[in-house]
Amino acid sequence: MAAHQMDSITYSNNVTQQYIQPQSLQDISAVEDEIQNKIEAARQESKQLHAQINKAKHKIQDASLFQMANKVTSLTKNKINLKPNIVLKGHNNKISDFRWSRDSKRILSASQDGFMLIWDSASGLKQNAIPLDSQWVLSCAISPSSTLVASAGLNNNCTIYRVSKENRVAQNVASIFKGHTCYISDIEFTDNAHILTASGDMTCALWDIPKAKRVREYSDHLGDVLALAIPEEPNSENSSNTFASCGSDGYTYIWDSRSPSAVQSFYVNDSDINALRFFKDGMSIVAGSDNGAINMYDLRSDCSIATFSLFRGYEERTPTPTYMAANMEYNTAQSPQTLKSTSSSYLDNQGVVSLDFSASGRLMYSCYTDIGCVVWDVLKGEIVGKLEGHGGRVTGVRSSPDGLAVCTGSWDSTMKIWSPGYQ
């Protein structure tokens, strides 16, 4: 028996040594390098093909959004009268993400203090506190019925929680979805039974909550997937099968959730695409990138119809009062050349981190790395205001589904609810 055991141990050691030989490790490293080289080659080829397609589209594109709206009257500063009526205080660390409920009565927030909180949007009072299974949260979501909430982040998992009406401080875990091999950057409920996840492993996934399993994987991206967007359906607990994704590969993809391949794609630029939002009618989409540009695409014409640039936004407002980029103060004296010379280096480092539209679609709210939340006139491509007041970096902006308020979240651990300040 002893001899047999010794033989077994010797055999086991020989097998182990076989699999950890330096040559084998070198082979594995070589295979990994080969895969990365193939991915990079595919990226470059894809960019070249998209450049040819965009060139052909540009030849037949007869107008842009700004050209068509040339005769529309510009908005003035006095039209943007949003005031921070409610400040939501309760978190002890940075606000990672937040969402409005479908009926606009609640706000779900997730923080790196290890909690998700549900707030009454009318009073600013806390309704529920949900301890997270991981404090390294990057995204949160609330179901259309507001009975489920979800969190995801650096632990590579998406956790679904039931919202309890009896126990206001509880961790009622319904499901934990595991399968991504890298961090989860964004999540969205498509309805009360399904949730989408976007991950740094270059894939998106659709999960069935009642069955607790993955339904489908979407893998067209060649870089980290950084954000998701779904068309708004404010009066329904069901949504369409359409969703969009964007990532570090510079692409925005439009998907039919029933198909594993994208139905439409737009090459934005070489920067990371951090923010994505559908226009109110669901027929256009905007993508915000690390280089500070916001591009709007029309799904029907399959092309870009507008680009919102901080340089253009400031310069276009020269005949009327404008906001200076250096300190965002209201000013009427400086010329376009002066503005450009004093702010160019500052504007170069302003990546877009969040986007949303007003209920009418005339205004677009965009959060930049250091500038904060800027308000755009969508039809004119001009900056018409700024939501100021946070003591730290503004990380997100979302308008309520009913259109009556806007919420901003910040690294100062607070959120502010903005609504019209009528006198």
Swiss-Prot record:
One of the GO biological process terms: regulation of pheromone-dependent signal transduction involved in conjugation with cellular fusion
InterPro entries: G-protein_beta_WD-40_rep, Gprotein_B, Guanine_nucleotide-bd_bsu, WD40/YVTN_repeat-like_dom_sf, WD40_repeat_CS, WD40_repeat_dom_sf, WD40_rpt
Pfam families: WD40, WD40_Gbeta
Domain of life: Eukaryota
GO molecular-function terms, A-Z: G-protein alpha-subunit binding; G-protein gamma-subunit binding; protein kinase binding; scaffold protein binding; signaling receptor complex adaptor activity; small GTPase binding
The keyword tRNA-binding belongs to this UniProt entry's keyword annotation: no
Stored CDD domains: WD40 (cd00200)
GO cellular component terms given for this protein: Cdc24p-Far1p-Gbetagamma complex; cell cortex; cytoplasm; G-protein beta/gamma-subunit complex; heterotrimeric G-protein complex; mating projection; plasma membrane
The protein's role, per its UniProt record: Implicated in the a- and alpha-factor response pathway. The beta and gamma chains of the putative yeast mating response pathway G protein play a positive role in initiation of the mating response. The beta and gamma chains are required for the GTPase activity, for replacement of GDP by GTP, and for G protein-effector interaction.
Name the UniProt record assigns to this protein: Guanine nucleotide-binding protein subunit beta
Organism of derivation: Saccharomyces cerevisiae (strain ATCC 204508 / S288c) (Baker's yeast)
